[in-house]
């Protein structure tokens, strides 16, 4: 017995002794020690010098059960050993004999113990595998097996892990999943055309947990005793090999070895129209393998050509000055994924290929020396269009903050569509740190309740000498007002948008439109508009009554101060939400863009908190909802957010405190 076999025997003995202890704590500790011992030597990558040439015998029982939809030109072989012969079959397929079956058994036990949560819940095929476990002890589907709870399945898993430490144990379906991770290969689980209701759970390709390369495939068949025309009882596993391998083992060595399959694949790549008859006897691959390679090569060439044309189409559109939307791009190239589109788009913007995304005329007049100084590099390095574009955007934001003007991201994005949200907030945070005395310019308040002003009529008027000009001059230290180029860009609303806004406002003021229906019916309108109109519906009479209070005894200056105070109170009453809704601080000197942003954030936060609390309560009550049920209650929450919260709950995290 070699030193390797002695170490494996010692590891199995330690695991068998740890089985006698209660629970899995002792067994997990023994598995950690076994992992350190087994990691000192790796599994062989190729067949070594064994005891001699093996006599391959076809398993007639398994051959009679071999399904028609399984790979052709393959034969199940007889394997010697005890138990269900899973590890003996894998050792025979990998190294030509069953000499490493005990080591595969020990490594599989360690894999199942140290990654228990993955095989029970964290795997993509966990539901499929658990259904297969439910049916593994029966020949057909039954209500008893279908209704097994998760706690019972975990107990079966623990019992199977403990039994695997002994050579004569029965292997289940999760042993196949763990074995695939141990040998770093796909396992084609071949199940006979019997027990048809439960066959889809067993007849499938099982992939390893992690694999850094393209894995090969082992074919292992479920074999056993046929019961009737449609049923059979599983008893053992049989290794399945290709017919050419059996013929190669039994044939006498020829005078010259055939070229390896890689040579045939290289020849096929050089000559796409090559047929199998041209190869004749000078190839070591079968006819089906050859034509499968040729078909895959053609598909690969077509895929490469499609990606090439799609990327160049996107580059041309950028150079012409138009950003192709995602939907239009996918209609033209449906084979390209969304992530690939955004990766190419980000690459083009970052490398400066998007020359059409130029800033306005005022920003183009910025000198290159100022750009180079802001970058901290030479003017030659700063001459790249992408770098100059980003630096101008940064200087624009810093200049606005220096003028006490806080540009929201939506206005900033209209000028610089290539800048991401995170970059904007990083620049803004740094600029605010360099300007500790930053205070937004107070907005002009009129005495009276606020009326919805169309953006296209009054927001684009030029600044004139007056209250706004004086406020801007004070904010800039008595200098000239801020130039129009550095003001937030406001796009006038079209006629149909105004009609839509007026219709929504009328329904909200009438009290006939709840918030959830408002979001579904008017997705283009901001949630803050709903709450502003809702507060107007309740505070409007009070505001009107306050506006008409006469003040005959006040002087001219006192009357002006009273009107200013009364206007401030009206604005606060009009913007504040009703009782029971979210609080929002609104003052005469607050930026209206900031008010809208705060209300949007509060509305989004509240609905997210409600959705999180709902999922957390259902998770604690063991009745977690499906996405279909969840989307009926929270239709505005994305599917990815639902699965992210679900994964966090199953990982033991808490979504909402308290």
Swiss-Prot record:
Acts as a transcription factor that regulates development of thoracic vertebrae. It is found in: Nucleus. GO terms for biological process: regulation of transcription by RNA polymerase II. GO terms for molecular function: DNA binding. GO terms for cellular component: chromatin; nucleus. Belongs to the vertnin family. Its main location: nucleus. PANTHER family: VERTNIN (PTHR16081:SF0). The gene is VRTN. The keyword Zinc-finger does not apply. This is Vertnin. Keywords: Developmental protein, DNA-binding, Nucleus, Transcription, Transcription regulation. It comes from Bos taurus. InterPro entries: Vertnin-like, VRTN_OTU_dom.
């Amino acid at each position: 017995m070699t030193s390797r076999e002695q170490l494996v025997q010692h590891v199995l003995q330690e695991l068998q002794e740890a089985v006698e202890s209660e629970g899995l704590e002792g067994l997990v500790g023994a598995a950690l020690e076994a992992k350190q011992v087994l990691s000192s030597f790796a599994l062989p990558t190729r067949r070594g010098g064994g005891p001699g040439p093996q006599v391959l015998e076809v398993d007639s029982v398994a051959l009679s059960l071999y399904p028609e939809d399984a790979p052709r030109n393959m034969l199940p072989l007889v394997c010697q050993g005890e138990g269900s012969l899973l590890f003996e079959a894998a050792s025979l397929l990998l190294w030509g004999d069953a000499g490493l079956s005990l080591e595969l058994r020990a490594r599989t036990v360690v894999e199942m113990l140290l990654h228990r949560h993955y095989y029970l819940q964290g795997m993509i095929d966990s539901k499929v595998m658990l259904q297969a476990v439910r049916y593994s002890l029966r020949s057909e589907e039954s209500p008893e097996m279908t209704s097994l709870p998760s706690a019972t399945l975990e107990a079966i898993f623990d019992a199977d892990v403990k039994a695997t430490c002994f050579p004569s144990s029965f292997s289940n379906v999760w042993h196949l999943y763990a074995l695939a991770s141990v040998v770093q290969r796909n396992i084609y689980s071949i199940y006979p055309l019997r027990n048809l209701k439960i066959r889809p759970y067993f007849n499938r390709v099982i992939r390893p947990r992690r694999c850094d390369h393209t894995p090969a495939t082992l074919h292992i068949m479920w074999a056993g005793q046929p019961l009737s025309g449609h049923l059979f009882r599983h008893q053992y596993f049989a290794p399945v090999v290709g017919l050419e391998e059996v013929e190669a083992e039994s044939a006498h060595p020829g005078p010259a070895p055939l070229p390896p399959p890689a040579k045939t694949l290289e020849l096929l790549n050089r000559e796409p129209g090559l047929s199998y008859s041209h190869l004749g006897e000078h190839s070591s691959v079968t006819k089906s393998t050859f034509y499968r390679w040729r078909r895959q090569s053609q598909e690969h060439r077509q895929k490469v050509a499609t990606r090439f044309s799609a990327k160049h189409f996107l580059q041309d559109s950028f150079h012409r000055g138009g950003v192709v939307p995602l939907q239009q791009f996918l209609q033209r190239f449906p084979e390209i994924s969304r992530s690939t589109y955004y990766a190419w788009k980000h690459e083009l913007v970052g490398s400066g290929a998007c020359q059409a995304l130029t800033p306005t005329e005022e920003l183009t007049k910025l000198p290159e020396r100022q750009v180079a100084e802001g970058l901290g590099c030479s003017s030659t390095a700063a001459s790249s269009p992408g770098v100059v574009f980003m630096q101008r955007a940064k200087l624009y934001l810093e200049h606005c903050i220096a003028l006490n003007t806080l540009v929201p991201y939506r206005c900033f994005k209209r000028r610089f569509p290539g800048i991401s949200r995170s970059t904007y907030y990083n620049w803004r945070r740094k600029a605010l740190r360099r300007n500790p005395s930053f205070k937004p310019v107070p907005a002009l308040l009129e005495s009276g309740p606020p009326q919805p002003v169309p953006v296209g009529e009054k927001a684009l008027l030029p600044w004139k000498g007056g209250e706004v000009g004086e406020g801007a001059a004070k904010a800039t230290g008595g200098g000239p007002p801020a130039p129009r180029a550095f003001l937030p860009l406001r796009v006038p609303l079209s006629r149909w948008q105004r009609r839509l806004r007026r219709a929504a406002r009328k329904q909200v003021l009438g009290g006939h439109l709840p918030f959830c229906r408002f979001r579904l019916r008017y997705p283009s309108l901001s949630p803050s508009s709903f709450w502003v109109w809702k507060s107007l519906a309740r505070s409007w009479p009070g505001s009107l009554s306050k506006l008409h209070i006469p003040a005959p005894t006040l002087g001219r200056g006192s009357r002006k101060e009273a009107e200013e105070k009364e206007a401030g109170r009206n604005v606060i009453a009009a913007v504040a939400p009703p009782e029971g809704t979210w609080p929002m601080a609104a003052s005469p000197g607050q930026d209206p863009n900031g008010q809208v942003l705060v209300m949007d954030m509060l509305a989004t936060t509240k609905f997210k908190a409600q959705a999180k609390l709902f999922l957390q309560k259902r998770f604690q009550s063991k009745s977690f909802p499906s996405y279909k049920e969840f989307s009926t209650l929270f239709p505005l929450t994305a599917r990815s957010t639902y699965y992210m919260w679900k994964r966090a709950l199953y990982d033991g995290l808490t979504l909402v405190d308290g």
